[in-house]
Amino acid sequence: MADQLTDEQIAEFKEAFSLFDKDGDGCITTKELGTVMRSLGQNPTEAELQDMINEVDADGNGTIDFPELLNLMARKMKDTDSEEELKEAFRVFDKDQNGFISAAELRHVMTNLGEKLTDEEVDEMIREADVDGDGQINYEEFVKVMMAK
């Protein structure tokens, strides 16, 4: 399943994995998963977190390792309901729900994920996605960036 992913996608997932894996032990626990999800404005119960881990935990050790995450991501990317997931992701970034992701909103979410970005890095991320040049990212631009991955 994971062999359908590009090297670039795998590198991005590795980066995301290390954001979740707070103690760097190579495994994501329910506690680490919960921390990241709460920083993204979600509020999963302990049971929901356990279900998410169990869904991917191939070796049954109660945590997610990187190969298990890759399999989950490959499966999710094949799912056709990605439109709804994209809308949900956009809503997480668009804090004031005005239909646009500003540099401040992007910085806020990335900081919550543990990514300390300089103003230049945030501006660069906006510039890369900002097709119409208005200095922020609308939903169409967001989808384009996410689908290009």
Curated annotation (Swiss-Prot):
Binding locations of Ca(2+) 2: 57, 59, 61, 63, 68
Domain of life: Eukaryota
Stored SUPFAM superfamilies: EF-hand
Entry GO terms, CC: cytoplasm
Family annotation (Gene3D superfamilies): EF-hand
Pfam families: EF-hand_7
Residues given in the record as Ca(2+) 3 binding sites: 94, 96, 98, 105
Family: Belongs to the calmodulin family.
Other facts: This protein has four functional calcium-binding sites.
Protein name: Calmodulin
Species of the source: Zea mays (Maize)
Species lineage: Eukaryota, Viridiplantae, Streptophyta, Embryophyta, Tracheophyta
